[in-house]
């Protein structure tokens, strides 16, 4: 049996901050679902401590089950840095624990496909054909989940991937309207660029309408968030590529919560690289969610009435990982006629099928600032026979501006 190595191992000192008070338990989706101590944040911290001596298969299983929602970080009265602990633990498992061959192949497939926009564009017609053929329904059948559970899960969450939308390119420059208030670079992303390019376009249009000069460079192809959250070493190279591509801009705006949380954490990710540590810290300080930039600046373009009742879902990597809760709400409240409804248990991750609280609001649409949340909520509401459209906040603001 192997144990954690000395390369960025999770720090015992950070583990010692946990006093086992249990405030994290009701906010942890896996603990709420299964009720197992080792599927809670404090239980996983115990396992991390054990990993310094021995990495066992049960340890890996319980760590893998963590959704990385960081709701425990928000709830913890002792300020335990669980986000740093889990980020340092996952790479240890990838280096020091041999996963079964099918699982290794699955993970490699995900990384080699989803972090490459060109490959995603090539796959878009296949995804669209699969959607038309009802693959999502087939994937929910017990036999499919038994034979290929991971692929069945992906099929069930597949986005609407019209080839025309996937192939559309975003203009590289959106000039500010009126007097310029600032200049920003918009991260296009990988999945966001291909399957949610309309969100990138809406983001750029709102920023430009409110006085920002928006640059949308083709590079980087991916910020590395997917691999970072999975503990894959490829995240380091993608982080360096992202810094090199965008560090010349004063502000880097992001409209995908998972990407933003990863990029704001580059300083921690590259802390042991003397050639990149300083650059990473300076870069991370310039990363802002698009809603932060717009809420701080205040509206300039006229907002026209948009009569809708919408429920706002807090994306975990925005609310918990970045601490950004009010800016998206503020932007939505600026839209005349838009009724914003707050769901119960806002802190619970939609990854644990947490959509009932959204349906209970009676809203006619859901608003979420992360593509993963959009896919998850869309899939689950459809599965329950109560399909709701899911928008990024800036899609509705853009529609209001016209």
Q: How should these model regions be labeled?
A:
Residues 40-50, 60-67, 220, 319-321:
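A short glycine/small-residue-enriched secondary-structure motif
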Residues 3-15, 53-55, 60-63, 208-210, ...:
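Short, intrinsically disordered, charge-biased short linear motifs at domain edges
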Residues 1-7, 30-58, 79-108, 386-394:
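Non-heme iron-sulfur electron-transfer modules
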Residues 16, 35-39, 227-233:
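Alpha-helix capping and helix-loop boundary segments enriched in small/acidic/polar residues
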